[in-house]
A protein has these predicted regions:
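Membrane-proximal HAMP signal-relay module
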Residues: 1-82, 94-104, 119, 232, ...
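Generic structural signal for secondary-structure transition and capping sites
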Residues: 39-42, 90, 136, 246
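DHp/HisKA dimerization helices and adjoining segments of the cytosolic kinase module
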Residues: 97-213, 217-223, 227, 233-247, ...
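Residue-level recognition of strand-loop junctions within catalytic nucleotide-signaling folds
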Residues: 212, 286-288
Length: 294
């Protein structure tokens, strides 16, 4: 009788312990990670015992870790942008203070203040755009984009802004180049790259857009005559607020354009990278082919 009562009791105890380790322990780990987030400890990760499980709790654990990594990356970027933005705003604010205390005429003072305010507005808008591109993960609407037509629109604006001749902005991609993506974000990316290329090229230089089809992708490149950059800087130029020394001609800008361009291209499934080519820098884009243009 005693044996008959002990064996079922032991079996029940072992079953409870197994269920506890199988269900309650990983749930406690998930709760601990959620509490760590609440305490701003975004670097906390679940144990491999939880994330390596092949059941729903393992899937939930991996989702928790992915969410934690994403939150940590987003918060780090926003904190870095805030620090950089506050640093970048000091210079125009100092110039505004000097201008307000100067003996310049009213017309000169207005022009100076207008320039500084416009620059600060562009800086803030670009910073907010970069932060939005990094945090906004909803899928953008796809559409068919003819690269040649997009280039013509962008170069018209660029010639007006830079006083360059249209002959200096060449398109070596024919009308058969159609890509799949979001028109607004692709236009912004290509416009930022074009402005960067013009800024760093000599006054009589050439900026050319070329490309070739490679399977289901179009490989496009934008090449300038600005002398290129050091090999070690080819990836660094995509970091926010990165401005290299005087190795390349041209000045101006806040070092946000290429970072925004890369984020914009990546948001539509593309890739953007840089390489030195010829007498300048080549920006390479890989974009999905649109196979049935209309």
């Amino acid at each position: 009788m005693i044996t008959n009562g002990v064996i079922p009791g032991l079996f029940t105890l072992l079953l409870c312990v197994g269920l506890y380790r199988l269900l309650v322990v990983p749930l406690n780990h998930l709760r601990e990670q959620a509490n760590a987030w609440r305490a701003d400890q975004l670097n906390v990760r679940l144990s491999r015992r939880t994330t390596n499980r092949a059941d729903e709790l393992g899937e939930l654990g991996r989702a928790f870790d992915h969410m934690s990594e994403r939150l940590q990356s987003t918060v780090a970027l926003q904190q870095q942008l805030l620090r950089d933005l506050s640093h970048e705003l000091r210079t125009p604010l100092s110039r505004l203070r000097v201008a307000s205390e100067s003996e310049q005429g009213l017309e000169q003072l207005r022009e100076r203040i207008g320039r500084e305010v416009d620059g600060m507005q562009r800086l803030v808008e670009d910073t907010l755009q970069l932060a939005w591109l990094d945090t906004e993960r909803t899928r953008l609407p796809d559409e068919a984009i003819q690269v040649q037509a997009l280039w013509e629109m962008l170069t018209e604006n660029a010639c007006y802004e830079s006083c360059w001749s249209p002959a200096q902005l060449r398109c070596e991609v024919d009308a058969s180049c159609w890509v799949r993506g979001n028109l607004n974000t692709l236009a912004q990316a290509l416009e930022n790259m074009l402005r960067n290329a013009i800024r760093h090229s000599p006054a009589g230089g050439i900026v050319a857009l070329g490309g070739r089809r490679a399977g289901k992708y179009w490989h496009l490149w934008l090449e300038d005559q600005g002398g290129g950059v050091e090999e070690a800087d080819l990836e660094r130029i995509f970091l926010p607020f990165t401005r290299l020394d005087g190795s390349r001609p041209g000045n101006g800008g806040f070092g946000l354009g290429l970072s925004i361009a890369r984020n914009a291209v990546q948001r539509q499934g593309g890739k953007l990278w840089a390489q030195n080519a010829g007498s300048g820098l080549r920006m390479n884009m890989r974009l999905l082919v649109h196979t049935s243009p209309v």
